[in-house]
């Protein structure tokens, strides 16, 4: 046998051995290199998964499910996978350690922008954190939320709040839907920052009702969110309804946009966001998209926080008394100014305590896994929806003493801030997707709240006692429409 034949025999036998070993190697790979499992969660039913388990207050139900399944759990909603983080440690993993991968946005099919050009120019609904999204955040920060921009709008915010006070004063003794009026004020603060004009009226319906309607449609789950294959069928007709509602919102500033495009020099006494957008040659569609998103993200969140703060103050007269006392000592008889806010620690603590118990976005906005990743020893597959249940974290007895009581004092000697670094307390989120409007929210909410508490006495109508305002989360919104929470403001003499 010559050496060539021996070499050929050896290679042939190595090949045969390798072939025989292959199944074993594959089995070993399967056993040892198997990706970690999905996060634990309730058993999913065939086809519907866990859809029926969420109910009408998903954050409340998810909080109780997390007690059974742990701080990182997964549920199936139709064909979609939902992952929920419910502890500060899990929130830190999602919003800091894996922020790059998990900062995609999951957008409901009824809200999703079909035009790819607009999708690239979206802020809250941008599916990825693209350069366009970064640029948009930078423009909004520079023009609206930076220290300089915030200072340039102080007088505007104070004026709008005084208009609310003047209107309320004309209603002495009457039953008033105060929170509708607060919503009007917040919308007008925003619309003046965008266009230097009011878009809402205390007496008439208009923009605010269209925004309610659009928000309601956006929050209503759509079957194609759970079964994307049904997307083209538009079973609820919700896309048509959202399009109508959005069309009516856009119509409220269409004329202004046209006018301002024609003007060479806008002539407004202070710069607004529209001026910045026109300078960088944004088209109408692009401007509409961003302003729409800023309205939807900024108006309801601030109003709900004020509404809950007032509700908690009525429920807790001692806290109301202490807050009034602080306001009287620091402000005296004059109207509240933004320059007073840094000197009102108890007011700031009341706002923080309200955001702990009643975060207006209890699950943040839905994030999306842009790639498959491993978190806390579990796999989160690409395109899963990822939520952080800050409502559950705000009421967790492992994190807070006596978590259900409204005790602003807990924030007085504490260094806890809502700026996205303390993961037990993130009402504005954290990481790349943190709320860009935090600076504005953190000024307009205490300004309006302090004004309402300082200038008015709050009492309930005779036929309602404080037990009746023992509301469940999100019921406030329902109350507003079906059985509005009517508080009687009495102007203090
Ligand atoms: C009390 C007031 C507010 C609270 C509690 C709040 C809270 C939040 C939260 C929790 C998020 C989602 C963060 C995430 O998904 O991780 C968010 C996003 C957002 N907020 Fe706010 N917000 C408030 C006021 C405002 C205001 C006044 C504006 C602007 C006018 C605003 C504009 C936005 C936008 C555009 C986003 C989407 C950001 C993105 O996806 O990149 N918010 N906010």
Protein language model regions, located:
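Conserved cytochrome P450 K-helix E-x-x-R motif and the immediately C-terminal K′/meander segment
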Residues: 51-70, 251, 334-377, 387, ...
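Cytochrome P450 heme-thiolate "Cys pocket" and heme-binding signature region
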Residues: 376, 414-445, 472-474
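Central I-helix of cytochrome P450 enzymes
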Residues: 186, 190, 194, 245-253, ...
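Conserved cytochrome P450 K-helix/beta-meander segment immediately N-terminal to the heme-binding cysteine loop
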Residues: 388-417
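Cytochrome P450
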Residues: 2-22, 76-83, 148-159, 169-192, ...
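Cytochrome P450 heme-binding "Cys pocket" and the immediately downstream C-terminal segment
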Residues: 317-319, 386, 438-478
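Cytochrome P450 substrate-recognition site 1
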Residues: 35-51, 60-156, 177, 182-189, ...
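Conserved cytochrome P450 catalytic core segment spanning the I/J/K helices
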Residues: 145-149, 173, 187, 219-224, ...
């Amino acid at each position: 046998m010559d050496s060539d034949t021996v070499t050929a025999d050896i290679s042939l036998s190595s090949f045969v051995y390798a072939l025989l070993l292959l199944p074993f190697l594959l089995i070993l790979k399967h056993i040892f290199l198997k990706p970690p499992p999905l996060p634990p969660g309730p058993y999913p039913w065939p086809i519907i998964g866990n859809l029926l388990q969420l109910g009408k207050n998903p954050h409340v139900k998810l909080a109780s499910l997390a007690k059974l399944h742990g701080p990182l759990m997964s549920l199936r909603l139709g064909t979609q996978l939902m992952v929920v983080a419910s502890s500060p440690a899990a929130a830190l993993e999602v919003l800091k350690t894996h922020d790059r991968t998990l900062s995609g946005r999951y957008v409901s099919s009824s809200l999703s922008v079909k035009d790819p050009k607009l999708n690239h120019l979206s802020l809250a609904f941008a599916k990825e954190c693209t350069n366009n999204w970064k640029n948009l955040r930078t423009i909004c920060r520079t023009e609206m939320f930076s220290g300089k921009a915030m200072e340039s709008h102080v007088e505007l915010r104070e004026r709008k709040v005084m208009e609310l006070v003047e209107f309320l004063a004309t209603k002495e003794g009457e039953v008033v839907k105060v929170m509708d009026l607060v919503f009007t004020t917040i919308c007008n603060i925003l619309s003046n920052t965008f266009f230097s004009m009011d878009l809402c009226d205390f007496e008439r319906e208009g923009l605010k009702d269209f925004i309610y309607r659009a928000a309601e449609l956006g929050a209503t789950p759509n079957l194609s969110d759970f079964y994307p294959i049904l997307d083209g069928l538009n079973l609820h007709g919700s896309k048509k309804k959202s399009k109508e509602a959005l069309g009516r919102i856009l119509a409220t500033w269409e004329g202004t946009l046209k006018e301002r495009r024609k003007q060479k020099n806008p002539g407004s006494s202070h710069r607004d966001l529209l001026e910045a957008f026109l300078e960088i040659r944004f088209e109408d569609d692009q401007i509409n998209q961003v302003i729409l998103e800023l309205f939807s993200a900024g108006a309801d969140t601030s109003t709900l926080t004020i509404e809950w703060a007032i509700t908690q103050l009525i429920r807790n007269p001692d806290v109301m008394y202490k807050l009034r006392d602080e306001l009287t000592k620091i402000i005296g008889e004059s109207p509240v100014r933004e320059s007073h806010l840094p000197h009102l620690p108890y007011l700031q603590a009341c706002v923080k305590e309200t955001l702990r118990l009643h975060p207006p976005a209890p699950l943040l906005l839905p994030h999306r896994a842009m790639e498959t990743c491993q978190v806390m020893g579990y796999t989160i597959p690409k395109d899963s929806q990822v939520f952080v249940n800050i409502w559950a974290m705000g009421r967790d007895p492992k994190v807070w003493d006596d978590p259900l009581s409204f005790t602003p004092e807990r924030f007085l000697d504490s260094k806890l801030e809502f700026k996205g670094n303390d993961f037990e307390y993130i009402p504005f989120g954290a990481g790349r997707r943190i709320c860009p409007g935090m600076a504005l929210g953190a000024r307009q909410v205490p300004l309006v709240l302090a004004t309402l508490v300082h200038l008015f006495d709050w009492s309930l109508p005779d036929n309602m006692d404080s037990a009746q305002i023992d509301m469940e989360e999100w019921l406030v919104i329902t109350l507003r429409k079906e059985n509005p929470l009517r508080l009687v403001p009495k102007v203090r003499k």
